[in-house]
Curated annotation (Swiss-Prot):
Keywords: Bacterial microcompartment, Calvin cycle, Carbon dioxide fixation, Carboxysome, Photorespiration, Photosynthesis. Belongs to the RuBisCO small chain family. RuBisCO catalyzes two reactions: the carboxylation of D-ribulose 1,5-bisphosphate, the primary event in carbon dioxide fixation, as well as the oxidative fragmentation of the pentose substrate in the photorespiration process. Both reactions occur simultaneously and in competition at the same active site. Although the small subunit is not catalytic it is essential for maximal activity. SUPFAM superfamilies: RuBisCO, small subunit. Pfam families: RuBisCO_small. It is found in: Carboxysome. This is Ribulose bisphosphate carboxylase small subunit.
Amino acid sequence: MKTLPKERRYETFSYLPPLSDAQIARQIQYAIDQGYHPCVEFNETSNAEIRYWTMWKLPLFNCTNAQDVLNEVQQCRSEYPNCFIRVVAFDNIKQCQVMSFIVYKPNQANSGYSGYRY
């Protein structure tokens, strides 16, 4: 019996093929269009028991396009190259987090792919 190689899965999107930069931008733009406030967070590990990640600056309350968020991701990535980076969207009406996904994994940095996700 052939089994699939063990691969660590992080969140819902990790079960899909790697997202391109354009697909990540569309996900972020969807969150902005829904009225959610994006935020960039980073952490050295992505273990499930780690519930609190460090915020990169404050949430982007006045953000109107995905490129602003991607610029913050790039700044965070250059400052903390050995950390996982994720984008989180907050709903200020429900007062909760409604979306989050990892856009950068440090162990894939030298794979030759220039995208945000892998």
